Structure formats: C-alpha cells, structure tokens
Amino acid sequence: MAEATTNTTTIIARADQHDIDLHKASDRVNFGSIREPIDVPYLLGVQTDSFDWLIGNERWQKRVQEDLENGTNTVPHTSGLDEVFQEISPIENFAQTMSLTFSDPYFEEPRHTVQECKEKDYTYSAPLYVNAEFENGDTGEIKSQTVFMGDFPLQTPHGTFIIGGTERVIVSQLVRSPGVYFDRSQDRTSDKEVFGAKIIPSRGAWLEFEIDKRDVLGVRVDRKRKQSAIVFLMAIGMTKDEIADAFKDYPLVMDALAKETVQTQDEALTDLYRKIRPADTPTPEAGKNLLDSFYFNTKRYDLARVGRYKINRKLGLEKDVNDRSLSREDIIATIKYLVTLHAGETKFPGKRDGQDVDLRVDVDDIDHFGNRRIRQVGELIQNQLRTGLSRMERVVRERMTTQDPEAITPQSLINIRPVNATIKEFFGTSQLSQFMDQNNPLAGVTNKRRLSALGPGGLSRDRASMEVRDVHPSHFGRMCPIESPEGPNIGLIGSLATFGRINPFGFIETPYRKVVNGHVTDEVEYMTADRDAEHVIAQANQELDENGNFVKKQALARVGEEEAVDVPVSSVDYMDVSPRQMVSVGASLIPFLEHDEGHRALMGTNMQRQAVPLIESERPLVGTGAEWRAAVDSGDVILAEKPGVVTYVSADIIRTMNDDGTTSSYKLAKFQRSNQTTCYNQVPLIHDGERVEAGTVLADGPATQKGEMALGKNLLIAFMPWNGYNYEDAVIISQRLVQDDTLSSIHIEEYEIDARETKLGAEEITRDLPNVGEDAVANLDERGIIRIGAEVEAGDILVGKVTPKGETELTPEERLLRAIFGEKSREVRDTSLRVPHGETGTVIAVKEITREDAEEDGDELPNGVNQMIRVYIAQHRKITQGDKLSGRHGNKGVISRILPEEDMPFLADGTPVDIMLNPLGVPSRMNLGQVLELHLGWIAHAGWDISLDPDAEAAWKKYVPQGAEKGAPGTPVATPVFDGVRPETIKGLLSCTLPDRDGNKLVGPDGKATLFDGRTGEPFPKPISVGYMYMLKLHHLVDDKIHARSTGPYSMITQQPLGGKAQFGGQRFGEMEVWALEAYGAAYTLHEMMTTKSDDVDGRVRVYGAIVKGENLPPAGIPESFKVLLKEMQSLSLNVEVLNADGVAIDMKEEDDDPSTSSDDLGFNIGARPDAAAKEDQVAEEPEFQ
C-alpha cells in the first residue's frame, strides 16, 4: 500500500529481505532458550521469487549471478518467458520452407500505478514485447520486427495481482511430480502381489509396466490395454539380441523373450498399433508415427527438468537435467528396477555424482513430499502462456499457407488474441486465482503462503482419500500439520511451514544445522524430503552447552521415516534449526501451542485470520516473538528504506532526508475498504526530527501496533460460571468494552450505480424523482448524489436515478402538456440506488466517473455506460450480543449477555473483570494453552522479579533465561512455540509478581484470586482463576446475520418467498415443522401456513385487503405449488383430475396470477404501506406546475 518517492522519481517500497535488513531489537522479554542460527526467510518469497523468475527481472538476475559465483543452484538459470518462447520457436509451415522465431521478450513501463488501478478498476499490467524473426527458406529473406504480445499482468510488491481493480492472489498448487513411480498391490483374484511402474511426464502420454500374478511382464501405452513389454522394446528399435544382452541377468525378462513370437521391428510396430487403435488399419509406419508422437516428439512429450531429475535419482542415471525427453536407456532401467523389486531384492546398481552406488529398492509413497512438488505462481502463468502460444502457433501455420510469401511480415502472421484470452481466463476464473483475504495482515500472509492440492491437474475433493489428506512425516518443516480448513477441504489445503522454501525443481526444502562428531555447527543446509530419510536428525530442543556440544550422551532423533528414537550423539548428522520449524506463520503466533490439542490449535490458527481489525490495535501481552516478522512481511506496515532523519509527518505522508543526500516520501493509506469490507488505515508511529535506520517501522497498518501483529485485545478474564449465562461456550462481557469502544471496529461498504443508454433513451442521475417527497432527497446535492458525511439508514436514497418507461399512445391532453412543458412530463420510473435492508452508516466518500472525464483522463467506462457513481458507507460497529469472540487456542464463543460494569465480579482492589468464560470449556477440549496464557498474562500485567523468591536455588529459576529475571508492569513477553515457559516456571513467577500500589498481591501463587460478586459485594466461596488473555473479535458479526422479512420477493415458479438474507427471503417452514404442527393438531395454523402465508397468490392479496379494511379473513384458495405439482405430473404424461369435496372435477384453468393485477381489482396498492397510501394520493393530487 505504501508508495515511496526518491528524488521525485516514484518507486514502490518493498518491505522484504531482498532490499532491507530486517534485524530489530524487540522490546518483548523472550522466555525462549533456543537460539535460531538463521532468520526466517522472507514470508512472501514463495510468491515474489517465482514471479521474478517468470519475467526475468533484475532481482532474479542478481540471484543467478550469486548462484554462479557460489556454485549453487537455488534458482533456475533461464527465465520463464525465455523458456516458453524458446520452446515454441521456430514455428514452421508444413513444407518447412518458412519459419518464425521469437527471442528476447521485454516489458515496457506499466501504464498505471497500483493505486490508480485499484481506484479506477484497471488491471495492473505492463505491455510485453518480443523480437519476432520471419525467414523465407525459398528466397533466404529474413524480416525482423518487435511485436506487441498484449498487456501482461504484473505482481505488486507484496505478491498480489490487481485484476479489474480487485486484489487477487495466485495460490501455489501441490501436485504429483513427473518421474518414475513403482508400486505393489494385491491381486484381486489370488493372494499374489502385482508390481507396477509408471513413467509420468509433465506433458504427454503415460507409460506403464506391470508384472502380473503369472509373473508376465506387460506394458500399457497411454493407459490403453496391456500388451507384451518385449514387443514394445522391439518396436522402439531394439533387436532380440540387444534385449538379451541388456537383460541377461534378469531371468523374468529372458523367459518372456524366449516365448515371444514377434521377430522384427515392423511386426512389433504393427502388433502394437493393432492393440492401441483396433479400428484402424495397422502398418509399421502408422505404428512408428504413433509411438513417436506419444513419447519421442519433444513438442508433445516433456518430462520437464524435474521429471528428468526424479528419474535420474530413482534409477541411478546421470543424464543432463535439461534432457527432457524419454530415452531407451530410461525404459531399460525402469524394467530392470521393476524386475529387481519383484524379485524381492533390496539393492539396485546405479550412479550418483559420478560414483557407482547401490540404490535402495522400494515402492514409492505417492503422498511423500519427495514425490509431490509445488507449482508456484510463475510456473502456473507460464503453463497458461504455453497453452495460449500453442493456440497462436496454429493460427501462424494457417496464415503461412494462405498469405502471399512476399508480403508476409511477423506482425501479419501473429494473432495475440488467444494468448491474452488464456491469461485473462486464468486470472479471472481459475480455481487457483483467489480473491485476496484482506481481513487482517495475517490473513493476507497466509493466503499467499497457501498450498492447494485442488485445481486443474490436481485432486478433486470428492475423490481425495484419507491418505492424501493425512499428515505425513515428510511434511515436517515443509507444510504445517496444523493449519488446514475444517470443511471438505481438510488436508487438501495446507500452509507452507515457517522456514520452508521452494527449490528450482519445485520441491519444498527445510533447513538443518550440520552436526560434526557431536558438535552442532552454525552451518545450515537446506534439504528436500527424500534426503531426510538418509540422515539422522536431532530435535531443536536438545540441550547444548555454550560451545555447541550436546550435554547428554543420547539424543532424540529421527532415523529414516520411523518413530523418533534415542541415538548416541556421535551418530547425529543434522539438527533442526528451530522448534517452530514444523509449523506455519499462523500457528507460530499461538503461545503455548505445545499444550493445545491438535484440532483446537487448528481452529485457533484459522480464527486468527478471521479477527477484525479494531479501532485501536493492541499487541498481545503474551506473544511468541513471531508477531513482528509476520506484520512486517505482510507489507501492511511501512518501513524506512534508507537511514536518515524524518523531516515531515502528517496523517497521510511521511518524508525523510536520507544520509546519502536523497529524500524519500512514504504515502499512507487512509480509511480504504479492504476486500472483506474491513477498514484499511495506516497511522504514523514516528515524530518530526526523529532518527530512523533502514528497516525502522514508520507507520502501523490495520491490526498492528509498534510494527507487531495486533489482532485483538488483552482483557481481564475470570474462569467462572455466572447464572447459566455462559453455559455451552457462551460469553459474558462487561459494558465497559462497549462504552470504551474496546472491541469496536469500522466496516466500509461500497455501493455502485451506473447510468446507461437504453432503447428508450438515456438514464439520468437527478434529484428530481417521480413520487418522492422532499424529505427523502434532503441529503442529495443538486446532481442527485448523497453528500459526504450524511447519516443514512435502510431505504435512504444514495443516488437519484430515473429510467425512461415504455412510451404509450398519448392523449390530446398529454400532448398539450408535453408541448407546453417540453420533456418534463415524460414517463420515467424511479431506479435510484438505495441503502439495502438492514444496512446503516455514514457516507465517507463518493467517486464519480462520467464519459467526458473518462475520455480526458484516458479512463475506460464499459460500453453503453454514461456515468458511474460509487458511494462508500462506513459503519462503526460496537461489540454486541450475538457477536463471536475467540482466544488463540480454539476457545470460541458467542456473547450471550452484556452486564453493567457494576454487576461484574471484581478483584479485591475493586477492578471488575472484563469477561467471564465457562471453566467447563477447558477440560474436554484439552486446550490448556489458554490457562497458561491467562497466568502468564497476569504476570506480564503485574510485573515480576524473581529475586522476590527467597529460595535462590529454586529449580524453576534455571529455566528463566538471561534478561527475563524481572519485568515492569505491562511488559510484553514472548513464549516461542515448543520452546515456551514451563508450567513450573509460571508457578514460580506467580509467587514473584510485583505488589500493587497498596502493597497487595491480588492473585495468589496458584493463579487464583478471591472475587467479589458485583451485585451483593460478597466474596465468592472459592478462589477463581483470573488473568489476562488475548481475545479476538471475529468477522462473524450479528449485524450481518440477523434478518427479518415482512413483504418481499416471491419465486416465479412456486410463488413462495425466496430463501436467505441476500435475497431478502422468508423463513422456511419445512417438512419437519409441518409434522410438529400436525402432532399438535393445529390444523388452522397449519392450513394458514401452507396457503395464505406461503403461495396462495390470490388468497394472500385478499387477506391483505381484508386486514387493511378491517374485515374478517376470506377462505384460502389453492396454493401455487399444488399447480406446479400438477404440471410436473402432466409432464410425465399422467392425466390428473382435481376433485372437490363432493367429487366434482374442478377446472384448473390457466389464469393471470399477477398479484398486482389482483390487488388493483380489489382497489388498493399492495406495494405501499397503509400510511403511505394517503401521502401518495396527496402527491398525485397536487398540480405539477406549482
């Protein structure tokens, strides 16, 4: 959101590790004892690094340069766009006499800034150009041109895309990696095992080998029926002698070779073709063409670099990773490995790094993270570009044959429409292109780090098995085992672990510290999941001395994929870098996560993302130390780019004079609407004249305080029941939270209306509306648009608009009036924009774009639209009954009662508690983290000094790290996940809290306090757990859910009210509710429910008339749904007759059931309220020319 200006040139400030050093001394007292040897990688790198590679920008070039200097391989060394244009070049005609080659793609500057795109509904993009060279082989003539390839969407500095004015995120996809896979399964008809091998490419046909229950080696080409593998080997050009030579040590293959009757390659090709295409005439040429098109044509078959890498590793080959086609050697090695696996042997000879090695023979686990890779944003867009270019290739070929060869230029051959259409479709409609979650900064970071197994080329949620969804040992340090949705997508959508990064092949790597002879070094190595199993890896919380040696002789370590075991420290190869290595950013923000049950931790992680930014953010007293990094990397706080001095601060701009003589200015976002209707606002933190370093936080964003994530409020909590009002997770809160706006938030809604050109004339934005009184338009300006600052409620007019009605034949009198008053008396209807039902608030902004303005500014209005107006309404929502509150441990509840402050239980010094939670919410849920947080929260609030405990040798004191021996009241503390404060330390600290100003300690060493009943002043009989807990207000607000309907729309077919708040629907009276009334024998009520109150069209109009006139209710008619049932039965060719009580047939004739005509017959207006009818008559009676 922040834009920085340096020496009058505008650049976008990017708060990431590429540009700014993020080291910062936090004022949190950290109780963690484990030092992390490396910083967390840039959290949005999963998005930005991939897009940098795609477009080949300077940041990517810098990383390639570093790779070449260090001899490493952390990024691909060819950019994504270059790769795609190299693949498609050259495009040749069928006679191969002409060719078109592409090279050197580059971008011009974007036409609009990110902010402009958001305000004016543009796509943030830059024009893409490429050099195209056409060569005419007959004449030798070469024509070169720079060709415009369309506007290419660009990534914003924070890893998002602006598509049509809305911010979107492309989610990374988790897919099966190309390569070779071996499996073993039980045969259905016997007790024997069947062995299979699949060679799966990135693009192209599968090749599968199988050894069945009769020990026969078969092959399936492109998933068709099985045939002899020997015939296949002969078809790809091997003679029987070559087969015998290659497989002389493999009796199973030799037996099959001896039995094979096919002798030559031609016979083999014919045989193969006959089985794949039984309907066509088999010939050797057809067979060869078929095989070549399946496996040996680089345009149609591509293993990709990752597929080649996987095949090399699995089969012990040493081919270049850029060799992306399938070779005879790969096929031979696959068959050898399969036969070795079938024979039950455990070793297979191969090569690794130029050495002869024995590879382990085993089946592959498809859910292992060595076999699943990530398709990042760059690769996903590249695949779309490839699809678009291949469609364009067809057009180019056709044009080569139809155009005059002399007149052809590259520009005349190329049609960029298919390329642009493919990319537009991907960003607009793909399952992986998501509306960005901007509820709070954490939601945004998580959205960008999400890993989805769904989407094109992935799994579907209906067919995904339990195994795919389950947590796998190889997820450790790569994908969080906790963070996942609760619904049908559980386990299919995950989140990248905190330290995880993605290598050039798309596999997730996690860092480990190298251990040499029991000494833990600071050298860090990143490893993929298939390398984990080859080493012995110790946990991060193993005790080390000051020199980095293990204190104990044994260490708990992972050996292969088995359970953790104790091993001698001399055999440890690596050690985890951090205890929070296995969890995601969201989960690492939960203190005492190690004391919470898994399901509740999952809920806690998900609910943090639903926290609404409050008017005044407050960071947690009890944190984990990850808050600062999560907030800074989200991009919602503004950081100083360079060291310098602040020269100017206002609410919307900060300027600094930098040490290098340049000036920078940082623009703050003020009261903008987020995608989730929350308020996006940035507030300066620094003062004029203050010194700043590079990376200093200059301004807070929504839900951040002092540059730390601040999603909720620290509130005084008591675990106690209160008159049953907090039964079953209900929550009782104090009136103080309402009065002081402690949990109040601002929500901004956007309403849009446009004036179009219609067949009957142009719509008009105006204040002059038909049949509308002056008081209804009092807040509109002379143009007919609401004034800023107006307080509006449901039904109020925001923008006045009239639309021409269909012209009817005019009477002489009307023609006379039309002649006198011109167009004034023309028939128009009121189509104004009104505040929807149930909404209210203050108008804070109005944006207007007219056709004239648009042409001047170069804006684009859709066809047929003359004027577009947007109105922004802000709501100030206080906390209220029915709103949902939650802690960070999955402890959620709905507010059932707001008590006056004087009725709340209070501490001995008179402090009333803020919230009462039910203690029964803890034991069965097993989320004890909330209890530990409560106690540590009190310690942090009260302050502590461990010297207050007279026992200097107390055992708990050795767990208090240096620097955490004492803290002033209100000191924020950090208890990192899996390295947090121990329960015994909390117990000790509770006895060392500082007394209040009267010298009293309100909470005892057991964490409990004597509370007094606010109503009687008497103490409660037992001490109660009291402390500070961080509570979040979730985006499940009762104002958005509560709904009531009196008169509203009906369904066209059934004539019953629609359903749901969005449709202004009614309350469904379903089949079970009908049974309930039947059980009570309430016949009249039931009859009324199913006719008058539902879909008896004529009847409900008559009832309305009877109520208005004060008459008795008329009898009900036939419900519309009965007529629908009749029609459905008649559509099944059934002749259905309707009989009355006397057995006489009723004629169900078609009649005009328009309720408005029925009401007109009865002489009243159904659309108006009774009190409005008189007013309307008055308005109609007044002469128009007054």
UniProtKB/Swiss-Prot annotation:
TM helices/strands, residue ranges: none
Single GO term (MF): DNA binding
Keyword entries, A-Z: DNA-directed RNA polymerase, Nucleotidyltransferase, Transcription, Transferase
EC primary class: transferase
Domain of life, source organism: Bacteria
Keyword Oxidoreductase attached: no
Listed EC numbers: 2.7.7.6
A Pfam family annotated for this UniProt entry: RNA_pol_Rpb2_45
GO process annotations (BP): DNA-templated transcription
Region spans: Disordered: 1149-1186
SUPFAM superfamilies in alphabetical order: beta and beta-prime subunits of DNA dependent RNA-polymerase
GO cellular component entries: DNA-directed RNA polymerase complex
CDD domains in the cross-refs: RNA_pol_B_RPB2
Catalytic activity: RNA(n) + a ribonucleoside 5'-triphosphate = RNA(n+1) + diphosphate
Subunit annotation: The RNAP catalytic core consists of 2 alpha, 1 beta, 1 beta' and 1 omega subunit. When a sigma factor is associated with the core the holoenzyme is formed, which can initiate transcription.
Role, per record: DNA-dependent RNA polymerase catalyzes the transcription of DNA into RNA using the four ribonucleoside triphosphates as substrates.
Family, similarity comment: Belongs to the RNA polymerase beta chain family.
Name the UniProt record assigns to this protein: DNA-directed RNA polymerase subunit beta
Provenance organism: Bifidobacterium adolescentis (strain ATCC 15703 / DSM 20083 / NCTC 11814 / E194a)
